[in-house]
């Protein structure tokens, strides 16, 4: 390429540990040599979040709102051990949760499929796209330890000054325990429904919403009712025209049905269910390192793409000791490619769109040609049978991808 592609504005969020190392390599080898970006960078590494009292996370979310495209590296969500390790001021909330709560919308996760990576669930021949409602429930809950005997109650105080309504949660008679209050909002559930129906129509696949409305009759029942109402009013005729269906399923029934299916559907999950099932589905396709994750906001134009896995702490500890690592960068690369593809769509930028697709194609073609990281070699041969010659280390694999991308773009004569 004789000149760089003009890419426009992108918010990038740096992360933690091994994924932070990989993130810099992706920019250095795969993105910045070819694309001129107006990059708005936010360091969401745990130390900087602590130093800014987590303000940097909120600032990043506001920047995504402004520029409509964000790409995020994996980050540490601290627990007690991490608070001690980094001497944190407090146990900061998940940055993903904070960003999602500011932006709203739905997280859609889809497996990246390579022909030579065997699937643990062998019947899955088509992708399953999980739409995770990225707002509220446990992720915005108030939870606490009940120190001793006493009553836990929930009170609703109407703004119009009419009478309060109090519900008894539990009377702790013989000691303490734990309690939690969580919520969701009709508007957010409606946005979730619209995003899910639109995704199903764009893919031409059926849509299933899973809840536990038999137990949470009011809470989960609200999700079921809102989805049904919106489907009947706005989407039923479009679904019928495409010969696809929408159904509500109980979560336990849906999990069983998904295992037996061949894939090829959209699965709309509440926040916690989506968190769990997206990892389960990713592993079923072969690897957690092979999963795209995109937050689509209700305005239809704001998108945040991220890796669907953690910070790969074990590999980072090895890297710190100077030991060889073989860390899979594919999900982090796809965070960039999906973000750039959306930027291209917003700006009607055909060159950037071509680049984003070329980057994804290179990842899949390189793996299918037999060049891969250790986790993927283990999927093929089984971990005990993997020899050193079967895989590339972290840096070798990134170099190989860089070499193949350079060749593909030269061939295209962009």
Swiss-Prot record:
Q: How is it modified after translation?
A: Acetylation at Lys-374 dramatically reduces catalytic activity.
* Binding site residues for NADP(+): 75-77, 82, 260, 310-315, 328
Tell me the cofactors it needs.
Mg(2+); Mn(2+)
Q: Which domain of life does the UniProt lineage start with?
A: Eukaryota
Q: Name one GO biological process term.
A: glutathione metabolic process
List residues binding substrate: 77, 94-100, 109, 132, 212
Task: Quote the annotated effect of residue 245 to S.
Answer: No effect on inhibition by cadmium ions
Keyword GTP-binding present in the record's keywords: the answer is no
* The EC number(s) this enzyme carries: 1.1.1.42
List residues modified as N-acetylserine: 2
Q: Where in the cell is it found?
A: Cytoplasm, Cytosol
Q: Give expression by tissue.
A: Highly expressed in the liver followed by kidney, lower expression in spleen, brain and lung.
Sorted alphabetically, the keyword list is: Acetylation, Cytoplasm, Glyoxylate bypass, Magnesium, Manganese, Metal-binding, NADP, Oxidoreductase, Phosphoprotein, Tricarboxylic acid cycle
Phosphoserine, modified sites: 389
GO molecular-function term, one example from the UniProt record: NAD binding
Q: Which reaction equations make up its catalytic activity?
A: D-threo-isocitrate + NADP(+) = 2-oxoglutarate + CO2 + NADPH
Phosphotyrosine PTM sites in chain numbering: 42
Job of this protein: Catalyzes the NADP(+)-dependent oxidative decarboxylation of isocitrate (D-threo-isocitrate) to 2-ketoglutarate (2-oxoglutarate), which is required by other enzymes such as the phytanoyl-CoA dioxygenase. Plays a critical role in the generation of NADPH, an important cofactor in many biosynthesis pathways. May act as a corneal epithelial crystallin and may be involved in maintaining corneal epithelial transparency.
Give the NCBIfam families listed for this entry: nadp_idh_euk, PRK08299.1
- Please give the name of this protein: Isocitrate dehydrogenase [NADP] cytoplasmic
